[in-house]
Amino acid sequence: MENFDKVKDIIVDRLGVDAEKVTEDASFKDDLGADSLDIAELVMELEDEFGTEIPDEEAEKINTVGDAVKFINSIEK
């Protein structure tokens, strides 16, 4: 399973949004209706899923689904 698909599954599960809405360009706040608590919980779940720690300064830069996938891809290299 690609990282995008894993991230998408987590978002659909955590936020309860339709899978079709979860695109690389989708903003967590504007397009998916996430608040700051939702985003913090998503970051924790991504950390668990990918076995990594996302520093706060990096987490603050994650505004879209694509941002999350890019970060995950960057740590797996």
UniProtKB/Swiss-Prot annotation:
O-(pantetheine 4'-phosphoryl)serine modification, residue list: S36
The UniProt record lists the keyword Lipid metabolism: yes
Modifications after synthesis and translation: 4'-phosphopantetheine is transferred from CoA to a specific serine of apo-ACP by AcpS. This modification is essential for activity because fatty acids are bound in thioester linkage to the sulfhydryl of the prosthetic group.
GO molecular function, one term: acyl binding
Pfam family, any one: PP-binding
Membrane-spanning ranges: none
Gene Ontology CC terms: cytosol; membrane
GO annotation (BP), single: lipid A biosynthetic process
Keywords in alphabetical order: Cytoplasm, Fatty acid biosynthesis, Fatty acid metabolism, Lipid biosynthesis, Lipid metabolism, Phosphopantetheine, Phosphoprotein
Pathway assigned in UniProt: Lipid metabolism; fatty acid biosynthesis
Domain Carrier residues, every copy: 1-76
Entry superkingdom: Bacteria
Main location class: cytoplasm
Family from the record: Belongs to the acyl carrier protein (ACP) family.
Reported function: Carrier of the growing fatty acid chain in fatty acid biosynthesis.
HAMAP family linked to this entry: Acyl_carrier
The name this protein goes by in its record: Acyl carrier protein
Species classification: Bacteria, Bacillati, Bacillota, Bacilli, Bacillales
